[in-house]
């Protein structure tokens, strides 16, 4: 059976949800892509405020409980040329490190991101005989990344499998222009799902 590794760029997925106006269920994402074979591991990358607030801690705990390996990096405040301050953290290096250091443990890498910075790492994976699937939305996926992948999945096409039902983004966020590495707040209530699952056991 084909071994699957899942790598989720949390900021990019958050930005996609803002653009689409509906939210992703992280447990369903895990189940959907694990169904492609035998899941080796699922990595989730997200920036966090320092110190973390309770909501963010619950979100991280819920992801861990679901089976994700969560990588975090503290947000830093940066000032741009216009004098505006942004909170920012980039986890590209962490994702690429896991992607390449675990290469012998999977056959297919599934990347939930549209970031063109991953074009070269994907080329390296394919040169090693690995299959790479990229999943995102077209309007947020670089041409280079989409072109180099073995397969591209439009998240809108699998909405029924990965959406969190009954949850909609606030109207002011729907279709909002996004800056992927400036946003970190979780959109779902996965921590509530984890609590409910514990109670059922």
Residue ranges and their predicted role:
Residues 1-201:
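Terminal and domain-boundary accessory regions
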């Amino acid at each position: 059976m084909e071994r699957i590794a899942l790598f989720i760029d949390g900021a990019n997925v958050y930005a996609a949800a803002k653009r689409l106006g509906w939210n992703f269920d992280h447990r369903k994402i895990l189940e959907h892509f694990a169904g492609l074979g035998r899941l080796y591991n699922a990595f989730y990358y997200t920036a966090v405020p320092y110190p973390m607030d309770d909501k963010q801690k619950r979100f991280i705990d819920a992801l861990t409980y679901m089976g994700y390996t969560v990588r975090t990096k503290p947000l830093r405040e940066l000032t741009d040329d216009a004098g505006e301050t942004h909170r920012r953290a980039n986890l590209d290096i962490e994702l690429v490190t896991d992607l390449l250091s675990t290469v012998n443990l999977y056959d297919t890498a599934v990347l939930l991101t549209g970031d063109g910075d991953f074009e070269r790492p994907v080329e390296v994976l394919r040169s090693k005989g690995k299959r790479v699937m990229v999943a995102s939305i077209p309007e947020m996926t670089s041409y280079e990344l989409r072109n180099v992948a073995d397969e591209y999945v439009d998240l809108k096409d699998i909405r029924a499998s990965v959406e969190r039902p009954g949850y909609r983004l606030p109207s002011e966020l729907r279709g909002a222009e996004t800056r992927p590495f400036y946003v970190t707040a979780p959109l779902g209530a996965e921590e509530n799902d984890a609590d409910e699952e514990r109670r059922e056991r």
